[in-house]
A protein has these predicted regions:
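Active-site core segments that coordinate phosphate-bearing ligands/cofactors
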Residues: 1-82, 87-148
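Nucleotide/phosphate-binding catalytic cleft detector across ATP-hydrolyzing
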Residues: 152
Length: 152
């Protein structure tokens, strides 16, 4: 659990960046952009590594995969996050840092899917949007670039 690691989301991510470890895809055999590859943990040089700060690394991995998928579909604009990811401060901070031009909106609604379906019927229906999370003062671009290189 991410709560077992001390510090704020930004402090946890900064500690991981100071001693980088990468979770490389894929940890599921259900398809996706890395179908046929097996998940593993490596250091910055691509050598096998024992992951540390596992909860932080797992949340960062999920944010990197989300960022990649949004890039693949050429998504622009706000990113609305709901469900358990919306409650994960590390995931939200990492996604906001990875996509500083796109507001990241963590929803705390329990009926987001129903609201989305209703908006398809009535796009003008008033919906209260959650507040955007400001990107943390972390530069994840070099980490993302290295992760994508190692994952390719």
């Amino acid at each position: 659990d991410a709560d077992d690691e001390p510090g704020s989301a930004q402090e946890r991510l900064a500690a991981l960046l100071a001693r980088p470890c990468f979770a490389l895809p894929a940890f599921s055999d259900q398809g996706g952009p890395f179908a046929g590859t097996r998940g593993r943990f490596v250091d910055a040089d691509g050598h096998d590594a024992i992951p540390w700060r596992r909860a932080t690394l797992a949340a960062l991995y999920c944010a990197l995969m989300t960022d990649l998928m949004l890039d693949l579909i050429k998504a622009r604009g706000a990113v609305l996050v709901e469900g358990p990811f919306a409650q994960n401060g590390i995931y939200i901070a990492a996604l906001a840092a990875l996509r500083p031009a796109s507001p990241v909106l963590p929803s705390h609604e329990t009926n987001g899917t129903s609201l989305g379906a209703a908006m398809l019927v009535d796009p003008d229906a008033p919906v209260e949007m959650p507040a955007a999370v400001p990107p943390p003062a972390l530069d994840l671009a070099p980490y993302r670039a290295r992760w994508r290189t190692l994952a390719a």
